[in-house]
């Protein structure tokens, strides 16, 4: 992946940053990939760094992600809830699956979607399991436990009844920005950067 560089003039000459480091200086974290352990570790490290720099300054987490690993996403979720700064979440493009859970878990009143955003919630996917029947049973029970946790989180952050969320995630439930606002996944739709 090609990462753009940004050149800035300083009193000591020119300084080159990769675009993500430059955004980090403005308390912006960009999640633009599927969520796996490596991506989660990078996002978490950035959040912890920004908290250490200024625990009172909001962090903006821009999300354009198809989702991914539940455990990696939950590590990001727990960090968002743990750190002192509010984490504002902004959906650009799409927030699907765990990406939608992270979008909904931003600070109350600071969860946004751009007008043409696509938000998808569904139950966790299970693929590629093989092995002994008892091992498959263990993994199946774990995926059901993770489904229960993510459903509870969506119900809490969207201010929905758990039964409604459980019904809605049985199949892919796709929303546009306005529908996501009505559902409680986001607080507002933003058209222009303020």
Curated annotation (Swiss-Prot):
GO terms for cellular component: cytoplasm; endopeptidase Clp complex. Keywords: Cytoplasm, Hydrolase, Protease, Serine protease. It comes from the Bacteria. It catalyses: Hydrolysis of proteins to small peptides in the presence of ATP and magnesium. alpha-casein is the usual test substrate. In the absence of ATP, only oligopeptides shorter than five residues are hydrolyzed (such as succinyl-Leu-Tyr-|-NHMec, and Leu-Tyr-Leu-|-Tyr-Trp, in which cleavage of the -Tyr-|-Leu- and -Tyr-|-Trp bonds also occurs). It is found in: Cytoplasm. It is an enzyme of class 3 (hydrolase). InterPro entries: ClpP, ClpP/crotonase-like_dom_sf, ClpP/TepA, ClpP_His_AS. GO terms for biological process: protein quality control for misfolded or incompletely synthesized proteins. The active site is at residues 97, 122. It holds the Pfam family CLP_protease. Its EC number is 3.4.21.92. PROSITE patterns: CLP_PROTEASE_HIS. One of its GO terms (molecular function) is serine-type endopeptidase activity. Fourteen ClpP subunits assemble into 2 heptameric rings which stack back to back to give a disk-like structure with a central cavity, resembling the structure of eukaryotic proteasomes. PANTHER family: ATP-DEPENDENT CLP PROTEASE PROTEOLYTIC SUBUNIT. Belongs to the peptidase S14 family. Cleaves peptides in various proteins in a process that requires ATP hydrolysis. Has a chymotrypsin-like activity. Plays a major role in the degradation of misfolded proteins. This is ATP-dependent Clp protease proteolytic subunit. It comes from Koribacter versatilis (strain Ellin345).
């Amino acid at each position: 992946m090609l990462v753009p560089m940004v050149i800035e003039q300083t009193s000591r000459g020119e300084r080159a940053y990769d675009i993500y480091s430059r955004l980090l200086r403005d308390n912006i974290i960009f999640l633009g990939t599927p969520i796996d352990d490596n991506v989660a570790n990078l996002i978490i490290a950035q959040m912890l760094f920004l908290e250490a720099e200024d625990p009172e300054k909001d962090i903006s987490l821009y999300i354009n992600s198809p989702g991914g690993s539940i455990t990696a996403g939950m590590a990001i979720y727990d960090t968002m809830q743990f750190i002192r700064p509010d984490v504002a979440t902004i959906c650009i493009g799409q927030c699907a699956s765990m990406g939608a859970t992270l979008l909904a878990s931003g600070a109350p009143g600071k969860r946004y979607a751009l007008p043409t955003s696509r938000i998808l919630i569904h139950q966790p996917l299970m693929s590629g399991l093989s092995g002994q029947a008892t091992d498959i049973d263990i993994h199946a029970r774990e995926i059901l436990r993770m489904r229960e946790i993510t459903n509870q989180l969506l119900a809490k952050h969207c201010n929905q009844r758990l039964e409604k969320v459980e019904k809605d995630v049985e199949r892919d439930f796709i929303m546009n920005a306005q529908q996501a606002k009505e559902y409680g996944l986001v607080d507002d739709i933003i058209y222009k950067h303020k």
